């Protein structure tokens, strides 16, 4: 899979989920930028893409290295929240524990909800017993 290196405010103007879908279809799994448009940033997580925010200086350094080295490859360790260059330089990035859990386990909002299926069914059964008029038919 591929990593997309971009400039600031990436995803501006793309308020629909089609933008992350297209990037995923093209083979990207992570996007690195100094900043992202808010809606795009959140849509990335909802669609299994990892948006990584680095400083402009860090992104500039990566662009220079990519331009100077054909076949340049970055390595991302989501569990450790690190990005490593071929020379061994490591950058850390922030991600909430919830979003990291979802990405590491391949969970979208439906998958996350289904992890609690037993609890949901138990609640429904308890409600059915205590308020049967809600369940006519």
From Swiss-Prot:
CDD domains tied to this protein: IPMI_Swivel (cd01577)
Protein EC: 4.2.1.33
GO MF: 3-isopropylmalate dehydratase activity
InterPro entries for this protein: 3-IsopropMal_deHydase_ssu, Aconitase/3IPM_dehydase_swvl, AconitaseA/IPMdHydase_ssu_swvl, IPMI_Swivel, LeuD
Catalytic activity: (2R,3S)-3-isopropylmalate = (2S)-2-isopropylmalate
Keyword Secreted carried by entry: no
Top-rank taxon, per record: Bacteria
Pathway recorded for this protein: Amino-acid biosynthesis; L-leucine biosynthesis; L-leucine from 3-methyl-2-oxobutanoate: step 2/4
SUPFAM superfamilies, alphabetized: LeuD/IlvD-like (SSF52016)
Gene3D superfamilies per the UniProt record, alphabetical: Aconitase, domain 4 (3.20.19.10)
One Pfam family recorded for the sequence: Aconitase_C
Keywords: Amino-acid biosynthesis, Branched-chain amino acid biosynthesis, Leucine biosynthesis, Lyase
One GO term describing the cellular component: 3-isopropylmalate dehydratase complex
Membrane-spanning segments: none
Family: Belongs to the LeuD family. LeuD type 1 subfamily.
Subunit composition and interactions: Heterodimer of LeuC and LeuD.
Descriptive protein name: 3-isopropylmalate dehydratase small subunit
């Amino acid at each position: 899979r591929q990593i997309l290196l971009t400039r600031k405010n990436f995803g501006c103007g793309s308020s629909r989920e089609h933008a992350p879908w297209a990037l995923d279809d093209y083979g990207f799994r992570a996007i690195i930028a100094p900043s992202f448009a808010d809606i795009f940033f959140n849509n990335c997580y909802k669609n299994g893409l990892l948006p990584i925010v680095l400083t402009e200086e860090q992104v500039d350094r990566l662009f220079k290295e990519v331009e100077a080295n054909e076949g340049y490859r970055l390595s991302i360790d989501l569990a450790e929240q690190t990005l490593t260059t071929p020379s061994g330089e490591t950058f850390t990035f922030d991600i909430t524990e919830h979003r990291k859990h979802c990405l590491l386990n391949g969970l979208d909002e439906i998958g996350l909800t289904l992890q609690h299926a037993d609890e949901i069914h138990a609640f429904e059964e308890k409600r059915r017993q205590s308020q049967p008029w809600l369940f006519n038919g």
